[in-house]
A protein has these predicted regions:
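Loop/turn elements at helix/coil->beta-strand transitions in domains of secreted/extracellular proteins
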Residues: 17-22, 59-64, 108-109, 138-142, ...
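Metal-dependent peptidase/peptidase-like ectodomains
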Residues: 87, 97-98, 104, 137-139, ...
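Sec-exported extracytoplasmic/periplasmic mature domains
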Residues: 57-62, 66-69, 101-105, 172-179, ...
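Structural recognition of the beta-strand scaffold that forms the well-ordered cores
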Residues: 2, 21-25, 62-67, 89-91, ...
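Second-shell loop/turn segments in exported
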Residues: 1-3, 35-53, 85-90, 116-118, ...
């Protein structure tokens, strides 16, 4: 049973779905992605991986397949997290989803699924945290961050080794330039973003008494392609405060700030929900979702010059937030 979206599934009689394997054939919006809105394109596609199995099981399906959430290329299926459901669920490459859809249009298709994925027992992991102490207000904190874990298929170079390196290099650039911001710059490599964001939750729990002193949180978790600027969950007043920073970022074309209604990145989401201004580096995303969550997420996908641009982008914003006279208005 092939459907393109949830509305098509819900429009079907239950008896037509019962006992079938449902394929969600939602096509990733390549044109939206190459226009600088790769994250939005991914968000439209990934809901079927995240929630498709639950929706199909409620209609009596015995299994689900989802067209991989990302740009189709090289017949690579993309892995990722899915909501718990009482039926098997798997991802297929974009090319194979198209093949199944074409065959289904011609008649009955029989599929045999052999799924070997499993979730092992929980183990102990750790966030990695380092502080560059503020010169005047060390109790006030600006976070720069990426996440340490990755899916098992690739090496995690773009998701999110690049983000960790960019955050580390932010502190290193300030040290090398002998800059001493007024507030503490805190570098965090978050643990377990991919499965449940438990590193984020542990940090907020451990620092619950200090959340009010968090001036801002930045994360890089969209690879290391050319930065366009930032997606930001901040007030309009805070956006005006950042106008001088945008002037500096314009030097290498990274001066856009797009306000968003919710946290731009997973690991800083809880802080954002508690009122901490949250920013995520906005890259052009031309190829990120081609390799994301696949065996092709390897170091050769990183362009050194673009990685340096991302480090400069985070360093400029991180230093500005840590050193400005008044913190961002919440």
């Amino acid at each position: 049973m092939v459907v393109n979206n949830f509305d098509e599934l819900k429009a079907l009689p239950r008896e037509q779905v019962a006992g079938k394997i449902v394929l969600y054939n939602e096509i990733y919006d390549h044109h939206k992605a190459i226009s600088g809105q790769a994250g939005a394109a991914y968000g439209e596609a990934v809901v079927y991986r995240a929630s498709g199995a639950v929706a199909a099981s409620q209609m009596g399906a015995v299994g689900t397949l989802v067209r991989s959430a990302g740009d189709g290329a090289y017949r690579l299926p993309h892995t990722g997290w899915s909501s718990d459901a009482p039926i098997p669920a798997g991802a297929v490459s974009a090319e194979d989803a198209g093949l199944i859809a074409r065959l289904a249009a011609q008649g009955k298709v029989r599929i045999h699924l052999t799924l070997t994925t499993h979730r092992g027992p929980d183990t102990t992991g750790y966030n990695v945290v380092a502080d560059l102490k503020g010169s005047e207000h060390p109790e006030q904190v600006v976070i720069v961050s990426g996440h340490l874990d990755s899916w098992d298929l690739g090496t995690g170079a773009i998701d999110d080794g690049a983000g960790v390196v960019v955050a580390m290099e932010t502190a290193e650039l300030l040290r090398r330039l002998n800059l001493h911001p007024k507030r503490t710059l805190r570098v965090i490599a978050w643990m377990n973003e991919e499965m449940s964001a438990s590193g984020r939750d542990a940090y907020v729990k451990d620092h619950s008494a200090e959340v009010a002193n968090h001036v801002a949180a930045i994360e890089s978790d969209l690879g290391a392609e050319h930065p366009l600027g930032f997606h930001a969950k901040i007030s309009e007043a805070a956006q005006k405060q950042l106008t001088p920073v945008q002037t500096v970022l314009a030097w290498f074309g990274a001066n856009l700030i797009q306000l968003v209604p919710s946290s731009p990145e997973t690991d800083i989401e809880t802080l954002a929900d508690k009122g901490v201004p949250a920013l995520g580096i906005w890259q052009n995303g031309l190829t990120y979702f081609t390799y994301h969550h696949t065996p092709a997420d390897t170091l050769d996908k990183i362009v050194p010059q673009e990685l340096r641009e991302n480090a400069a982008c985070m360093a400029v914003m991180g230093y500005a937030l840590a050193d400005m006279t008044e913190p961002l208005q919440k």
